[in-house]
Swiss-Prot record:
CDD domains: Nitrogenase_MoFe_alpha (cd01976)
Upper taxonomic lineage: Bacteria, Pseudomonadati, Pseudomonadota, Alphaproteobacteria, Hyphomicrobiales
Protein encoded by which gene: nifD
Cofactor(s), by name: [8Fe-7S] cluster; [7Fe-Mo-9S-C-homocitryl] cluster
Residues binding [7Fe-Mo-9S-C-homocitryl] cluster: 283, 451
EC number: 1.18.6.1
Protein's recorded name: Nitrogenase molybdenum-iron protein alpha chain
Gene Ontology terms describing biological process: nitrogen fixation
């Protein structure tokens, strides 16, 4: 049993505050003062977690954040399957992020779907000196010739494009006209913009607003027959099939899903979304901007949902149903009742094996709070959590609805801090990303990737909860931990004792 579960709330709070002070001692005074604003111990009743967020990382620290290009191309636009997404700039940005997110989709790759292909303009020195617009023009022609069934193209700008002032908007307009009105979207997501991938999400949302919705209004399309029960899934990237498992529940309760943004999504679905009666928002951080725009422009309400774990699934189904008539409300209750035997079986099997185990999380802009309920459904206790690129409203939601008193909170935590926190709090499981995975596994700490589900999933929905429970049990109770132990679980060697 971890040390964190053996003390009172007051003792845990005091210990966590001491831990923060201890971690900050290694920094120069100015750096320590800045980092102190990002670390805190949550106090019950507070409206937020008491940390600063969405601020530039300190130069020289090993931040775990990404850039605006990653937020736009890697998160929002990349999963749109029937569009070609050009990484416009040097080859490295696209190459080293190629296929790193498991955005499942239906289609024939290279024919009518292009998610897992890497398109790059491969900038060279001469392109920096003389500009890359002519090269971009040629690339667009090549794409049209080689992939004639693509339904649109996005141009995802990398850093040099913004620095040299290329006019990708003019190229996009000219080529769109040349191709008979084809959708070509320039996205100014150069990596130097903003403080993290979060601004890339915002820029991508704005590109949808200006280059997709703007053209729909002007051209009077799409032609779409609405029903009273049309909804759009917003901010689900179909990691491991998450959006599909969510869609099943929505359709079983009587709703019609007319669009998925953007996992397994298409250009036609983006264009159809202004006809929805409700936008249901999964990843608030990356897609709240376009959801708010559609509410203001088209009068479409939106609500957040959380399909991690049965408790949150039931809450979300009822919240969504509240926007519709009794038919949908009855459908929600029917779905909850249908899956209750599955939930009972999963909890009966895995909760005894996971009860009381402690977890520390550090993920992107949503999962540090959304997955907490699923862990609690299994009897596990989240003792620390934080966001790579969360904003203040994310920490408000976390404080008001998810974390317990005395939980350790860390914003934009760096490699050093996270390792020290784990060493001191000694969790039974860490959930974070690929960069952290092997560090903690080498420390003999059970670990699960909470960005890509460690090549498992889906984790959304009732079926996903069964997979989630199995994977957490597999990580925590693997036989390998009988052969290797975390440093704090090993008896000190005679040599170390002599040295002391």
């Amino acid at each position: 049993m971890s040390l964190a579960t053996t003390n009172s709330v007051a003792e845990i709070r005091a210990r966590n505050k001491e831990l923060i002070e201890e971690v900050l001692k290694v920094y120069p005074e100015k750096t320590a003062k800045r980092r102190a604003k990002h670390l805190n111990v949550h106090q019950a009743g507070k409206s937020d977690c008491g940390v600063k967020s969405n601020i530039k990382s300190i130069p020289g620290v090993m931040t775990i954040r990404g850039c605006a290009y990653a937020g736009s191309k890697g998160v929002v636009w990349g999963p749109i399957k029937d569009m070609v997404h050009i990484s416009h700039g040097p080859v490295g940005c696209g190459q080293y992020s190629w296929g790193s997110r498991r955005n499942y989709y239906v289609g024939t790759t290279g024919i009518d779907s292009f998610v897992t292909l890497q398109f790059t303009s491969d900038f060279q020195e001469k392109d920096i000196v003389f500009g890359g617009d002519k090269k971009l023009d040629k690339i667009l022609d090549e794409i049209q010739e080689l992939f004639p069934l693509n339904n649109g193209i996005t141009i995802q700008s990398e850093c040099p494009v913004g620095l040299i002032g290329d006019d990708i908007e003019a190229v996009s307009r000219a080529k769109s006209k040349e191709y008979g009105g084809k959708t070509i979207v320039p996205v100014r997501c150069e990596g130097f913009r903003g403080v993290s991938q979060s601004l890339g999400h915002h820029i991508a949302n704005d590109a949808v607003r200006d280059w997709i919705f703007g053209h729909i209004e002007a051209e009077g399309k799409p032609k779409f027959e609405p029903t009273p029960y049309d909804v759009a899934i917003i901010g689900d990237y179909n990691i491991g099939g998450d959006a599909w498992s969510s869609r099943i529940l929505l359709e079983e309760m009587g709703l019609r899903v007319i669009a998925q943004w953007s996992g397994d999504g298409s250009l036609a679905e983006l264009e159809a979304t202004p006809k929805a009666k409700l936008n249901i928002l999964h990843c608030y951080r990356s897609m709240n901007y376009i959801s708010r725009h559609m509410e203001e422009k088209f009068g479409i309400p939106w609500c957040e949902y959380n399909f991690f774990g049965p408790s949150k699934i039931a809450d979300s189904l009822r919240r969504i149903a509240g926007y519709f008539d009794d038919k949908i409300k009855e459908g929600a209750e029917r779905v909850i009742e249908k899956y209750q035997p599955l939930v009972d079986a999963v909890i009966a099997k895995y909760r005894p094996r996971l009860e009381g185990k402690t977890v520390m999380l550090y993920v992107g802009g949503l999962r540090p709070r959304h997955v907490i309920g699923a862990y609690e459904d299994l009897g596990m206790d989240v003792i620390g959590t934080g966001y790579e690129f969360g904003h203040n409203d994310d920490y408000q939601r976390t404080a008001q609805h998810y974390v317990k008193d005395s939980t350790l909170i860390y914003d934009d935590v760096n490699g050093y801090e996270f390792e020290r926190f784990v060493e001191k709090l000694q969790p039974d499981l860490v959930g974070s990303g690929i960069k952290e995975k092997y560090v903690f596994q080498k420390m003999s700490v059970p670990f699960r990737q909470m960005h890509s589900w460690d090549y498992s999933g889906p984790y959304h929905g009732y079926d996903g909860f069964a997979i989630f429970a199995r994977d957490m049990d597999m990580a925590v109770n693997s036989p390998i931990w009988k052969r290797t132990k975390a440093p704090w679980k090993e008896a000190p060697s005679a040599k170390l004792q002599a040295a002391e």
